[in-house]
């Protein structure tokens, strides 16, 4: 009969019985030395975030391990895990937000200031001996969003923690916003969902994980969808794909890139087989700045090099190609005029916009017609930061900006008001009942489907709308209507573009293109019309979406080639015979929707809308610092303040992009930079750059002096 290592205790809860055993063992036995280590992932955690206290080198032949809050007080137990019975027993200070894993790690969700403090892991052997006591101090930072409101998102996403690791270390691919009502979760090595590339799957019904063909024995999959990779090698670098399958058989997919730092290889000798890789320099770029997609280890004997926007090798998504034989580059359909391709394969993007964010694919073709493909993700910092007195504007961003047929599109809502009664999504610029997709009531926390709901839309409580399996018919303008508690109404519009790999001119579909897509105040914008219908009797332009006389800009009669100016004509509009409209000297008042209305000879009508985005050049920001002279090991906070909204923030140190260390942290809106603790090398000049899609400005320098005691 097996002898229990837990002392009997009448009228004790399971936790107290286990606690009594552990307490007595503390008196009887001295802990032995064990190389158990605990790492906080991420190293800095802000209120409301999640943190994993990741355990390495957990001893073998254990009967149990216990986590408790503090250094010595065993009564502050969080949870105990029995390896014998594979069961978790929660302790007195368990808040309901902690999850204990069989590898010893502790997961804390939605952390608060009360979670700050020491955490201790104690391991107990099969003989009842204490094997190790290991402690870690967790510091939860106050949310520093006073300079701007963070955008919320219900989109499935993955965070690599840490963002870049060295060979032999561990990485956690942390899943955020996992959908509800899941059937299974899958991880794949690469950017393609293919059975042979499956690392592991987690089946909700059986609460178990199953390794796949691509499992190396070093991956651990958790019930929250996260994937832990231990003892990573440079072969682990690259893209990983997370796929979720819900009970209604709907799927969602998210990608993450694992970066393995192999710089030490130069000291140990070159690798036996150089791997083709692409590096984004810098890793995150502000709008208006430039970024280089730097290619490493380009193969020899090449015939051509190709760059594509996205992860799919479609001709319409080709940015540029470089032909080795002619030593020349050829521009592709997806070239925006801001890309420069070099003979070493690298691609330079200038004046980056939020539309440039996403994946890019490099394809090489050798003289023996062998191809290699590698992906890189471009991260564009579009976080807004503004003066705390400036209200945050309700905005909607389509993610991705241009979707391929069959992909999913998230209409991501930012700055949803708190005091709302309900919100409604419409598949049109008109807020009519027949165009209603769904209505969300905050009072009862319920979504009502409307007549325009196709069965592919999912509405989230943060206002965002997910459109799955997009088709050509989903292209167009969508309207979000907000109804406040005082019954005030606010609306916002967003354009959804679904690529069908066919140019609009071949479809005969009437479309309008804004040239340029983002307009600086005082500049000109052309609303360029494609595929104007034949046999027209007349066409009219309106400011807004309502076809009423007071909003009419101009009416053109085809037969008489005569134009009539309407009440909404400002004197700055020019109408061309092909239907296009040129707006001179644009102002902020010109921002918004415009409607082209056509009537043919059979009195059949057609209307189409376009949105003009007009931006003011940003004003120069300034930096506020808590102290300009600080002592070593103290802390300092720098805040970038701007009078503009809808801007991106980039921090500069000594005229170079600031490289964040583990001692530095940014607020979610990038407005505040915290350094804790301060070191001597932090002394120097700090600047912040504020940018929007049409301009950027840099603050005057602020000098930080570090006093060495």
Swiss-Prot record:
Tissue spec: Expression detected only in placenta.
GO biological-process terms attached to the record: immune response; T cell activation
Domain called Ig-like C2-type: residue spans: 631-695
Glycosylation sites noted in the Swiss-Prot or TrEMBL record: 73, 86, 103, 110, 133, 207, 224, 231, 327, 344, 351, 381, 462, 561, 578, 585
Signal peptide start and end residues: 1-34
A cellular-component GO term for this protein: external side of plasma membrane
Keyword terms, alphabetized: Glycoprotein, Immunoglobulin domain, Repeat, Signal
Superkingdom to which the source organism belongs: Eukaryota
Record-linked Gene3D superfamilies: Immunoglobulins
InterPro entries named among the record's database cross-references: CEA_cell_adhesion, Ig-like_dom, Ig-like_dom_sf, Ig-like_fold, Ig_sub, Ig_sub2, Ig_V-set, Immunoglobulin_dom
Segments forming domain Ig-like V-type: 35-142, 155-262, 275-382, 393-500, 509-616
Family as reported in the entry's similarity comment: Belongs to the immunoglobulin superfamily. CEA family.
Functional description taken from the UniProt entry: Possibly involved in cell adhesion.
Full protein name: Cell adhesion molecule CEACAM3
Gene (name only): Ceacam3
């Amino acid at each position: 009969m097996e002898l229990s290592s837990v002392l009997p205790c009448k009228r004790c809860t399971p936790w107290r019985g286990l606690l009594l055993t552990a307490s007595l063992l503390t008196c009887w036995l001295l802990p032995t030395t064990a190389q158990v280590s605990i790492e906080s992932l991420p190293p800095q955690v802000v209120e409301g975030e999640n943190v994993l206290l990741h355990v390495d080198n957990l001893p073998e032949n254990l009967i149990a391990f216990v986590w408790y809050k503090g250094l010595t007080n065993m009564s502050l137990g969080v949870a105990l895990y029995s390896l014998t019975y594979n069961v978790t027993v929660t302790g007195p200070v368990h808040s309901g937000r902690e999850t204990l894993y069989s590898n010893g790690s502790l997961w804390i969700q939605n952390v608060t200031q009360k979670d700050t403090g020491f955490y201790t892991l104690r391991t107990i052997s099969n003989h009842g001996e204490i094997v190790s006591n290991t402690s870690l101090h967790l510091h939860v930072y106050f949310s520093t969003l006073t300079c701007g409101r963070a955008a919320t998102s219900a989109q499935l996403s993955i965070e690599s923690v840490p963002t870049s690791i060295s060979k032999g270390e561990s990485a956690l691919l942390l899943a955020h916003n996992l959908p509800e009502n899941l059937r299974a979760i899958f991880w794949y090595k690469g950017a393609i969902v293919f059975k042979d590339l499956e690392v592991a799957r987690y089946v909700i019904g059986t609460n178990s994980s199953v390794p796949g063909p691509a499992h190396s024995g070093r991956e651990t999959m958790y019930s929250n969808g996260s994937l832990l990779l231990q003892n990573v090698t440079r072969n682990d670098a690259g893209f990983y794909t997370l796929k979720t399958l819900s009970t209604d058989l709907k799927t969602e997919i998210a990608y993450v890139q694992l970066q393995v730092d192999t710089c030490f290889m130069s000291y140990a000798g070159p690798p036996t087989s150089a791997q083709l890789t692409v590096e984004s320099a810098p890793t995150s770029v502000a709008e208006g700045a430039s970024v280089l997609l730097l290619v490493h280890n380009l193969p020899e004997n090449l015939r051509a090099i190709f760059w594509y926007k996205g992860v799919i090798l479609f001709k319409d998504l080709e940015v540029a190609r470089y032909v080795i034989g002619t030593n020349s580059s050829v521009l592709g359909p997806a070239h925006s005029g801001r890309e420069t391709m070099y003979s070493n394969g690298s691609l330079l993007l200038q004046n980056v916009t939020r539309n440039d964010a996403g994946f890019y694919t490099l394809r090489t073709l050798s003289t023996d017609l062998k191809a290699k493909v590698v992906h890189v993700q471009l991260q564009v910092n579009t976080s807004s930061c503004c003066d705390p007195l400036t209200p945050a504007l309700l905005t909607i961003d389509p993610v991705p900006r241009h979707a391929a047929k069959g992909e999913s599109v998230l209409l991501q809502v930012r700055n949803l008001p708190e005091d709302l009664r309900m919100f409604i999504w419409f598949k049109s610029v008109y807020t009519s009942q027949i165009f209603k997709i769904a209505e969300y009531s905050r009072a009862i926390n319920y979504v009502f489907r409307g007549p325009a709901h196709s069965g592919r839309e999912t509405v989230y409580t943060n206002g965002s709308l997910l459109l799955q399996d997009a088709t050509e018919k989903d292209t167009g303008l969508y309207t979000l209507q907000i109804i406040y508690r005082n019954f005030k109404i606010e609306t916002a519009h967003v354009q959804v573009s679904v690529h069908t790999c066919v140019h609009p001119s071949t479809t005969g579909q009437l479309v309008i293109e804004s040239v340029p897509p983002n307009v600086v105040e005082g500049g000109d914008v052309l609303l360029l019309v494609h595929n104007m219908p034949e046999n027209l009797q007349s066409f009219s332009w309106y400011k807004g979406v309502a076809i009423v006389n007071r909003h009419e800009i101009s009416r053109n009669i085809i037969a008489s080639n005569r134009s009539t100016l309407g009440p909404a004509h400002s004197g700055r509009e020019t109408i061309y015979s092909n239907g296009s409209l040129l707006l001179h000297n644009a102002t902020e008042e010109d921002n918004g929707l415009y409607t082209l209305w056509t009537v043919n000879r059979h009195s059949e009508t057609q209307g189409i809308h376009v949105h003009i985005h007009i931006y003011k050049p940003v004003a120069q920001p300034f930096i506020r610092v808590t102290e300009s002279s600080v002592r070593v090991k103290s802390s300092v906070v720098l805040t970038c303040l701007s009078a503009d909204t809808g801007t991106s923030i980039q921090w500069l140190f000594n005229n170079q992009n600031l490289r964040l260390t583990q001692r530095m942290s940014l607020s979610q809106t990038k407005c505040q930079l915290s350094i804790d603790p301060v070191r001597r090398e932090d002394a120097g000049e700090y600047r912040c750059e504020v940018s929007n899609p049409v301009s950027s400005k840099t603050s005057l320098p602020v000098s930080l002096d570090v006093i060495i005691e």
